[in-house]
Design a protein with these regions (language model features):
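N-terminal cap/lid segment of alpha/beta-hydrolase-fold proteins
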Residues: 24-61
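Cap/lid segment of the alpha/beta-hydrolase catalytic domain
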Residues: 60-145, 193-194, 200, 333-344
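Accessory cap/linker subdomain of secreted extracellular hydrolases
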Residues: 75, 82-85, 94, 116-128, ...
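Short glycine-enriched nucleophile-adjacent loop
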Residues: 143, 160-173
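Alpha/beta-hydrolase fold nucleophile elbow
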Residues: 147-159
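C-terminal, loop-rich substrate-recognition/catalytic regions characterized by aromatic stacking residues
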Residues: 229-245, 322, 331, 336-457
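Short beta-strand/loop motif that positions the catalytic acidic residue
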Residues: 284, 290-292
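Active-site-adjacent alpha-helix of alpha/beta-hydrolase-fold enzymes
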Residues: 300-319
Length: 457
């Protein structure tokens, strides 16, 4: 290339740079299709919950309602401030659902007091409230006050919002026809988020409370700043921080007292038992699509426990399970074709959104005919294929035991008393890292990382 052309390139880039920076943002498709309303919906005990509602401009026919309840804020706030997408996925963009987002009690713009994984209310008190009654009261208000709705409601949510779906599907409102608890918290001690069979999830919990701050004294749309730790090196930071008790001061104000509750209740006591949803998952009326990911380090337990419990305790429920090769919520962020260096041969998340999730809601909320969903749709890693089953766990499944042997081997045969063994030293001053990434965040792809760097220590 001639020298004069090379010299022109920086000049051209300098001229075009400001123009590119000033380029207008693409039109928001939601503003063209929806009108936004913000309302306070009264609950039976007088508390009002802030709800942001997107109403289709098409009034030629009635539309079903999709509801998400969340502790993370329903922003952007203001009736002239619109999301850039509504509903569970982009596949819903042209489906004209009425979509409602609600701040749960004590979070952001809603009134009341926030309680983590709120236990069930006291029976017999008509004014007592819990997440199921709040869901009932919200649905009742929506179907009675929103124009052009067809009287059918669905719910969806991932992680904590998925927990609110699992609680909400117990509300018994006749308009609630279909729900999708996705990576739901079902039992925070047994295997979701807080503890894994009694093992406190330090990095996950501490990182969560760095951003899950207490709000102001009154309802507010403001999102508090994330608490800064001053370093990207989480391994070094936790090593120097010392015992868990020493971390309390760093998150005490931010966590609304939840951190103290977590570390005070280290056994499966009444605190955790009251938050276990499994005993309550009975006689569930709406159709259920439970979704989870095999590589979900936070709530893998919840999805499987939800599906299994519905099978055992609510057999009449039209219940379906989808388990894909995903990290926490990955089916709703990206195409699901890979995690780190692990590739799955197809766009698994895009397929789920278009061919499973959308048809599920369209069938139960719009009466659209669709293929019958199998009881379980499960991705088999290694062979990289979807498999379907008429029961979960599959009827043909058999338990298989693995045994650790010496020299880093694994076997299907129980070792004898005289077989060799390997010994390891557990040194709290030199803990084994789970990832090579220099990061303070909980690394989602660590399950597929090459762990030989740690095994060589």
């Amino acid at each position: 290339m001639p020298l004069r052309r090379l010299l022109c390139l920086p000049v051209l880039a300098a001229l075009l740079g400001p123009l590119a920076a000033q380029a207008p943002e693409p039109p928001n498709p939601v503003t063209a299709r929806y009108t936004k309303r913000e309302v306070y919906i009264p609950m039976r005990d007088g508390v009002r919950l802030f709800t942001s509602i997107y109403l289709p401009k098409d009034s030629s026919r009635p539309h079903p309602i999709l509801l998400q309840r969340t502790p993370y804020g329903v922003g952007p706030y203001g009736e002239d401030a619109y999301r850039r997408g509504v509903g569970p996925s982009p596949a819903f963009a042209d489906q004209d659902y009425i979509v409602a987002y609600q701040d749960v009690r004590g979070r952001f713009m809603s009134e009341g007091t926030f309680v983590d994984a709120r236990p069930a209310r006291t029976p017999g008190d008509p004014k007592a409230a819990d997440e199921a009654t709040d869901t009932y009261d919200t649905i009742d208000w929506l179907v009675k006050h929103l124009p052009d709705n067809n009287g059918k409601v669905g719910m969806w949510g991932i992680s904590y919002p998925g927990h609110y779906v699992a609680q909400g599907m117990l509300c018994g409102h006749p308009a609630l026809k279909a729900v999708s608890p996705q990576a739901p918290m079902i039992d925070l001690w047994e295997g979701d988020d807080s503890y894994h069979r009694g093992a406190f999830q330090l990095a996950a919990n501490f990182g969560f409370f760095l951003f899950f701050h207490s709000r102001h004294d009154a309802p507010s749309p403001d999102r508090p700043d994330v608490t800064e730790v001053g370093t990207p090196d989480g391994y070094r930071w936790y090593l120097e921080a010392g015992p868990v008790a020493g971390l309390e001061a760093k998150v005490k104000q931010a966590s609304e007292g939840i951190w103290e509750e977590y570390i005070r209740h280290t056994t499966y006591d009444a605190y955790w038992q009251a938050r276990d949803l499994r005993p309550r998952l009975r006689d569930v009326k709406p159709a259920v699509l439970t979704v989870g990911g095999w590589f979900d380090a936070e709530d893998l337990f919840g999805a499987l426990a939800c599906a299994r419990t519905l099978t055992e305790k609510s057999p009449a429920t039209d219940s379906h399970l989808v388990m894909g090769p995903w990290t926490h919520g990955q089916w709703a962020s990206g195409d699901g074709s890979r995690i780190g260096t692990a590739e799955f041969g197809s766009k698994t998340a895009a397929w789920f959104e278009q061919d499973v999730e959308l048809p599920f809601f369209n069938h139960f909320l719009k009466d659209v005919p669709g293929p019958a969903l199998p009881k379980a749709t499960v991705f088999e890693t290694g062979s990289n294929r979807w498999r379907t089953f008429d029961a979960w766990p599959p009827k043909q499944a058999k338990p298989l035991s693995f045994y650790l042997e010496s020299q880093g081997r694994i076997s299907f045969t129980r070792p004898g008393a005289t077989d060799g063994f390997d010994a390891f030293v557990s040194d709290p001053a030199r803990p084994v890292p789970y990832t090579q990434d220099i990061s303070f965040d909980y690394s989602a792809p660590y399950m597929v990382e090459d762990q030989r760097f740690a095994a060589r220590r």
